[in-house]
C-alpha cells in the first residue's frame, strides 16, 4: 500500500456538460483518506458522472480533480494505478467459474499464474465463496455475483475504491454481507467512495456524507452533523386509520406552526419542533378531537428526513425524467 496524503480526493469547480445541460455543475469535494465517504443524491444528480470523471473514464469540461494529489486529466495513468471501480452491474464473465474470473483479473494485472491462483483462492475464501469456487458464474445468486465483482476489483488492493451503488437489487442478507466486506477493506487501509440511494446504507457505512443535487454539493458532514442540522426534535406519529390523516395534519399544523410531513405510510405524519412540550400539547389536542393516535415518538431527525428537507423529495422518489437523465450520463 502506498503512503497516502491526507486527502484521497480533492475537486474544485468540477463540471461536466451533456447536450448543453450541466450534469455536474461546479462540484467541490474534499475526501479524507482512510474512510468511507458517501455521496447521496436523487437520480440525475450527477453521482455516477462524478465517479466516472474521478476514475478517469470521462474528461471534465471544467474545474479540477485530484486523486491522492494527482490530476485526473494530466496524470490519468498514475491515478489509475491507485484506484479501482465497481459499478451497479457485474463486470465479471458469466462463462467462467468464480476462481477463473479472479485468476483472469490477476493475470491482467501482471501476476504470474501461480500468484494469480493464490490471490484468487485468498479472495474466494475471504468473501465466503469457497463452496462455489468451481461453479460457473451464471449459477451464482445476485449477492454472490456482487461479492465476486468486488473481489475482482481488489485483486490488486487499491488505495481508493469507487463503489457506485454496489447493493442495488440485493436482498437484505446480501447487502449486509457487502457492508461487512466494505468495512474490512477500510480497516485494511483502502479509502472507499460510496454512492447509494439507500439512506440506511449510508448511515451504516459512511464516515462522512456529501448530499448532491443538480450536480452540486448542497450539504456535507457526518451523519450526526447532518441530522442535527434540522434541529434535535422530530415528532413522529401514526394514526389509527389513514382516513383521519388530513384532519390530523390540519390540527398539527395549526398547533405547532410548522410544516407537517407525510410519510409513505398513509397513517404516518412527522414534524420538526424546537420544544418537546410543543409535541405533547399537539398530541393532547388530537386526543381532545377524538383522533386516535396508534403510536408516537420524539427523537432526532433521520437521514431520510434530512434528504427530504435538502432535496425536496424522498430518496426513493424516481421521476421518469430523473431516471432517464441518470441512464444517459451513467
UniProtKB/Swiss-Prot annotation:
ATP binds at residues 41-48. InterPro entries: AAA+_ATPase (IPR003593), ABC_transporter-like_ATP-bd (IPR003439), ABC_transporter-like_CS (IPR017871), ABC_transporter_ATP-binding (IPR050763), DrrA (IPR005894), DrrA1-3-like_C (IPR025302), P-loop_NTPase (IPR027417). Residues 9-239 form the ABC transporter domain. Its main location: membrane. SUPFAM superfamilies: P-loop containing nucleoside triphosphate hydrolases. It catalyses: daunorubicin(in) + ATP + H2O = daunorubicin(out) + ADP + phosphate + H(+). It is a peripheral membrane protein. Its EC number is 7.6.2.2. It is found in: Cell membrane. One of its GO terms (cellular component) is cytoplasmic side of plasma membrane. One of its GO terms (molecular function) is ATP hydrolysis activity. It is an enzyme of class 7 (translocase). Part of the ABC transporter complex DrrAB involved in daunorubicin and doxorubicin resistance. Responsible for energy coupling to the transport system. Binds ATP or GTP. Belongs to the ABC transporter superfamily. Drug exporter-1 (DrugE1) (TC 3.A.1.105) family. The complex is composed of two ATP-binding proteins (DrrA) and two transmembrane proteins (DrrB). This is Daunorubicin/doxorubicin resistance ATP-binding protein DrrA. The gene is drrA.
Amino acid at each position: 500500500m502506498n503512503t497516502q496524503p491526507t486527502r484521497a480526493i480533492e475537486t474544485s469547480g468540477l463540471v461536466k456538460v451533456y447536450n448543453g445541460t450541466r450534469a455536474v455543475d461546479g462540484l467541490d469535494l474534499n475526501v479524507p483518506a482512510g474512510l468511507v465517504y458517501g455521496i447521496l443524491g436523487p437520480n440525475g444528480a450527477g453521482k455516477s458522472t462524478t465517479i466516472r470523471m474521478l476514475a478517469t473514464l470521462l474528461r471534465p469540461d471544467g474545474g479540477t480533480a485530484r486523486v491522492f494529489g494527482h490530476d485526473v486529466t494530466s496524470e490519468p495513468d498514475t491515478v489509475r494505478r491507485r484506484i479501482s471501480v465497481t459499478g451497479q452491474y457485474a463486470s465479471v464473465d458469466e462463462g467462467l467459474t468464480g476462481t477463473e474470473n479472479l485468476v483472469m483479473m490477476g493475470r491482467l494485472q501482471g501476476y504470474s499464474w501461480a500468484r494469480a491462483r493464490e490471490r484468487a483462492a485468498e479472495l474466494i475464501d475471504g468473501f465466503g465463496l469457497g463452496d462455489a469456487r468451481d461453479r460457473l458464474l451464471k449459477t451464482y445468486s445476485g449477492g454472490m455475483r456482487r461479492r465476486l465483482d468486488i473481489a475482482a476489483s481488489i485483486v490488486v488492493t487499491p488505495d481508493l475504491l469507487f463503489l457506485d451503488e454496489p447493493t442495488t437489487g440485493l436482498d437484505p442478507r446480501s447487502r449486509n454481507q457487502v457492508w461487512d466486506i466494505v468495512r474490512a477493506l477500510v480497516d485494511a487501509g483502502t479509502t472507499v467512495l460510496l454512492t447509494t440511494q439507500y439512506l440506511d446504507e449510508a448511515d451504516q457505512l459512511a464516515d462522512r456524507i456529501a448530499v448532491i443535487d443538480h450536480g452540486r454539493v448542497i450539504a456535507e458532514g457526518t451523519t450526526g452533523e447532518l441530522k442535527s442540522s434540522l434541529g434535535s426534535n422530530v415528532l413522529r406519529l401514526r394514526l389509527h386509520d389513514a382516513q383521519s390523516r388530513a384532519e390530523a395534519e390540519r390540527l398539527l399544523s395549526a398547533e405547532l406552526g410548522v410544516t407537517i410531513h407525510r410519510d409513505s405510510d398513509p397513517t404516518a405524519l412527522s414534524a420538526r419542533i424546537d420544544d418537546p412540550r410543543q409535541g405533547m400539547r399537539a398530541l393532547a389536542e388530537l386526543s381532545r378531537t377524538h383522533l386516535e393516535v396508534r403510536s408516537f415518538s420524539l427523537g432526532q431527525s433521520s437521514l431520510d428526513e434530512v434528504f427530504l428537507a435538502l432535496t425536496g423529495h424522498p430518496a426513493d422518489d424516481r421521476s421518469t425524467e430523473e431516471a432517464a437523465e441518470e441512464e444517459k450520463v451513467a
